Amino acid sequence: MSMLCYTLIIAFLIGIWAAPKSEDNVPLGSPTTSDLSDTSCAQTHEGLKTSRNTDQRHLAPKKAEDQELGSAANIIVDPKLFQKRRFQSPRVLFSTQPPPLSRDEQSVEFLDNEDTLNRNIRTKRETHPVHNLGEHSVCDSISVWVTNKTKATDIKDNMVTVMVDINLNNEVYKQYFFETKCRNPNPVPSGCRGTDSRHWNSYCTTTQTFVKALTMEGNRASWRFIRIDTACVCVISRKTDNF
């Protein structure tokens, strides 16, 4: 009987000795579960860093390319900026297509540097009753849609940058200016047409007025009053040799 008890005790001890060791009994230098987790996290972090660096290397040329283009069409404008716009002028137009002809249907030229828009749009001057009576303009003027105005003088006599293209609601709009200027400072040899050259000196000159346009202020778009050509007038002065 005692022999059977000794046999059972020895078998029990052998079973305990052969059982798997717990994590607390792992020798120093053996990789525990926490060490494996840390190693796995570190490898994952390194993989993410490598992936990010690779993505940045692929994106860097594209960003540099965008900076080299420097297109004003990349400037995104908040639509709320147009809700705050006041003192609107019919001579300033934002459109995705070439602007319409002048309302009085006078000779209008549409000018642009791009090949797709490099064309002239002209309409014949509508016959007006006053022209049949022999009436003529004192000065000859020409009206032009300006599509590439980049610089202008503001109301404080400062040179400002005018936005040509803007990105509004994922659409590219151009800013057009309808300008009028003199065709010739001396339509007739004596100066302005119809003046008495015996008593008056005269010449035609282009005058300007202020319109509210979208300009760049630092890195932001803002409204400013700028000067544009709007009329052709006759300037006269009395000849002093008659006194």
Curated annotation (Swiss-Prot):
Q: Where is this region: Disordered?
A: 45-66
Which cysteines link up through disulfide bonds? Answer: 139-204, 182-232, 192-234
Q: Where in the cell is it found?
A: Secreted
Record's PROSITE patterns?
Answer: NGF_1 (PS00248), NGF_2 (PS50270)
Entry's SUPFAM superfamilies? Cystine-knot cytokines
One Gene Ontology BP term is:
nerve growth factor signaling pathway
Domain of life the protein comes from: Eukaryota
Q: In which tissues is it expressed?
A: Expressed by the venom gland.
According to its UniProt record, which protein family does this protein belong to? Belongs to the NGF-beta family.
Record text on subunit structure and interactions: Homodimer; non-covalently linked.
Q: What is this protein called?
A: Venom nerve growth factor
**What organism is listed for this UniProt entry?**
Cryptophis nigrescens
